[in-house]
Amino acid sequence: MSGSAPSIPNLLTLRGRIGGGGVTRGRYRGVIHRGGRGHGPGAPSASAAHDATIQGTDTDAAVSRLSAVQIGYIDDPYAELFAQSGPGAARRLPIINRGTYARTTAIDKLVDKFLDDTESSPEGRQIVSLGAGTDTRSLRLFSPSAPTPRKRVIYHEIDFPAMCEKKQRIVCSAPQLRSILSDPDSVEELSQHGGGNSWHSKAVAEKHKGSELWVHGLDLRAIAASQQPQQPLPPGVPIGSRGLHASPFTPGSTTQHEEQTEETSLPQQREPLTLTSLNPNLPTLIISECCLCYLPPSTASSIVSFFTTTIQSSLSIVIYEPIKPDDAFGKMMVSNLAAREIRMPTLEVYKEAEDQERRLREAGFSGGEGKGIGGARSKTIEQIWEEWTSQEEKERVDALEGLDEVEEWKLLAGHYIVVWGWRGVGVDLEI
């Protein structure tokens, strides 16, 4: 994708400037937050091309992560394994590096809180990352040098089969990962749902005894379809052929697609969907970093519903998405999308922080009789920087490369949010 192609500005891969007196279009790179997880509706004829485009955006996300690592914002010794090398390839603008830092540390904070709360769970606990791509959180978590032992953590990642195969190839070929994960084993699952290239590995370090990584090659909309009434497939269309496609945060496009109803765009399933080793009786955390926002609201809700109905233990969720589409900056984002015939359907419904919190409460993250404690909270990236980052840490980050575009930072960071919810006894993500 050309660097001049119009797309939504993003806290990871922005390659331009926001005008000092107002918002200007600028020059932005195609964007995605992590991995090939942008999933929008598409016709079967365009499926393969769009899937390939989305999967390619993982490279850009990995380079953005590496930029923050190389400059010193975050510590991730595995980032370079997943980023293509080249002179100056990893350098991002300070405003983007700070966004990468704030988002990464915020989600890490919530993940750590969940794991701390569930440390005493006798059978373990599990994390499910939607559209994980080549994200390195599981590697950092299971690293021998990780600051905290994390025993009995079952970590699930779900993404396109090709993305899962790519990650397996890197894990198998990188000597430095041998101290983290055992040799991956192929997992035969989900063939009736269009899945493939699933694999499994175990954490090697004794301090993480009993922890495992399960990588599921699966079109996320198959999960949504499993929650929908079954409808017949059109003649000649194989199960799972309606893949997940490009999104506002990917350099893919949906120009070939006509508007479709949510019902006709969902992959239809012939058997109930199950994820190998997903234990309904374990405390569970779901992570969606700019994944669900590219789906129709009912599809995104069905994916969440799959987990709220499947998991019988305590359940938590962390979502990272853009908000505020109706102000000047938000309208520019939406306009950039429309120029490429791409929509973010959930952004049209969950426009503000209170909408995102209500979304989680309506999904069941509110406690109540028979459910124990629960709640839904949110912070913009700007609030996370101001409220969750210590003064000492702010000074350290400022010293790395400085930030001249303070107002630009506030504008951009105010349009991204981390929203999280929890339900059930034994987990409290009140921060």
From Swiss-Prot:
Catalytic activity: [phosphatase 2A protein]-C-terminal L-leucine + S-adenosyl-L-methionine = [phosphatase 2A protein]-C-terminal L-leucine methyl ester + S-adenosyl-L-homocysteine
Keywords associated with the record: Methyltransferase, S-adenosyl-L-methionine, Transferase
Documented EC number(s): 2.1.1.233
Protein name as it appears in the record: Leucine carboxyl methyltransferase 1
GO MF annotation: an example: protein C-terminal leucine carboxyl O-methyltransferase activity
Region annotation (Disordered) ranges: 228-268
SUPFAM superfamilies hit by this protein: S-adenosyl-L-methionine-dependent methyltransferases
Cross-referenced InterPro entries: LCMT1, Ppm1/Ppm2/Tcmp, SAM-dependent_MTases_sf
One family name in Pfam for this protein: LCM
Free-text function comment from the UniProt entry: Methylates the carboxyl group of the C-terminal leucine residue of protein phosphatase 2A catalytic subunits to form alpha-leucine ester residues.
Residues binding S-adenosyl-L-methionine, per UniProt: 103, 131, 159, 219-220, 289
Originating organism: Neurospora crassa (strain ATCC 24698 / 74-OR23-1A / CBS 708.71 / DSM 1257 / FGSC 987)
Gene Ontology annotations of biological process type: methylation
Span of the signal peptide: none
TM segment ranges: none
UniProt similarity note: Belongs to the methyltransferase superfamily. LCMT family.
